[in-house]
């Protein structure tokens, strides 16, 4: 099932440990840098270099198993269960670069897709101001958010606020006294590492009405996904949780099947989640029987990238 949780190759792979530990640029910053370079190479009429960068980006996001024959010749209905928006945009960008429209300048169409990806992969609304003003504003927002009394079904939005260990401790105390009615907790783009989230987890899984936990754009790794999977298996933890957003982190390229199944069991009013593709055949018709992707790739690593077919099509 789904995109593999694979190793990254190339010179950028060495920065993974630093990103996960909270030092160095966040993973989304590296991805945005590649997208901006794709834009510049297309303006310089260097499409081959743009394809190489796109391949790096796809691999970094865990989409290296999405082969071009599927992109070019099949209706790609399968989407990455962690970040379907990025997957859809990357498929469109790959199609654009491999099969440029004859009546339209290549860079214009691809540049638009790159801008959409950059918007999606960054805390765009929080990057409009200077760094010093942003820091003052975010610390003020954190303080005010942790002082208010919550109403039933309310959301606590801490997205874009860089969190320290001390901040996480404040959040833990706040949740223990005010979290009984909390429905959605947004911790996107807060710089959370596995260690910081580990401090929060006991407070989070005790929340009786928490339905959504948003952890997009942080420094989390597969270790966090494993911890969440183990917690979901315990019916006394996260009793109301329906969705976890782990997209755009270090190496969480697909959610493990046990986590998805555990989330589905918490949705008594629905029979399935849109992110569970049971029985979906991802192989072209006539392919070998043993070539299908296993339903769970949790303990496997992606095979090395081989040469991709350079087929093209007229558009």
From Swiss-Prot:
Phylogenetic lineage: Eukaryota, Metazoa, Chordata, Craniata, Vertebrata
Protein name: Leucine-rich repeat-containing protein 75B
Record keywords: Leucine-rich repeat, Repeat
PANTHER family documented for this protein: LEUCINE-RICH REPEAT-CONTAINING PROTEIN 75A-LIKE ISOFORM X1 (PTHR39654), LEUCINE-RICH REPEAT-CONTAINING PROTEIN 75B (PTHR39654:SF5)
Source organism of this protein record: Homo sapiens
Protein family membership: Belongs to the LRRC75 family.
Location of the region described as Disordered in the Swiss-Prot/TrEMBL record: 1-23, 284-315
Biased composition (Low complexity): 11-23, 286-297
Annotated function: May suppress myogenic differentiation by modulating MYOG expression and Erk1/2 signaling.
Each LRR repeat, start to end: 182-195, 207-220
């Amino acid at each position: 099932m789904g995109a593999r949780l694979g190793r990254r190759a190339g010179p950028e792979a060495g920065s993974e440990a630093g990103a996960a530990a909270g030092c160095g640029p966040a993973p989304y910053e590296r991805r945005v840098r590649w997208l901006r370079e794709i834009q510049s190479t297309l303006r310089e009429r260097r499409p081959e270099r743009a394809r190489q960068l796109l391949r790096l980006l796809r691999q970094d996001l865990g989409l290296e198993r999405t082969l071009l024959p599927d992109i070019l010749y099949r209706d790609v209905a399968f989407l990455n269960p962690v970040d379907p928006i990025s997957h859809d945009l990357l498929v469109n960008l790959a199609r654009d670069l491999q099969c440029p429209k004859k009546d339209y300048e290549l860079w214009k169409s691809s540049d638009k897709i790159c801008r959409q990806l950059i918007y999606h992969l960054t805390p765009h609304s929080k990057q409009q101001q200077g760094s010093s003003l942003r820091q003052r504003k975010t610390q003020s927002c954190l303080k005010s958010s942790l002082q208010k009394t919550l109403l039933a079904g309310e959301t606590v939005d801490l997205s874009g606020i860089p969190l320290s260990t001390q901040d996480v401790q404040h959040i833990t105390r706040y949740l223990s006294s005010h979290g009984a009615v909390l429905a959605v907790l947004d911790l996107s783009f807060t710089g959370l590492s596995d260690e910081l989230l580990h401090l929060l987890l006991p407070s989070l899984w005790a929340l009786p009405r928490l339905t959504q936990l948003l952890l997009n754009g942080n420094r989390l790794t597969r270790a966090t996904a494993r911890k969440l999977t183990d917690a979901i298996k315990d019916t006394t933890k996260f009793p109301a949780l329906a969705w976890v957003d782990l997209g755009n982190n270090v190496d969480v390229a697909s959610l493990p099947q046990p986590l998805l199944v555990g989330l589905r069991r918490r949705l008594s009013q629905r029979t399935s989640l849109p992110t569970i593709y049971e029985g979906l055949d991802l192989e072209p018709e006539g392919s070998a029987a043993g070539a299908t992707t296993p339903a769970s790739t949790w303990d496997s690593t992606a095979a090395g990238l081989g040469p991709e077919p350079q087929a093209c099509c007229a558009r």
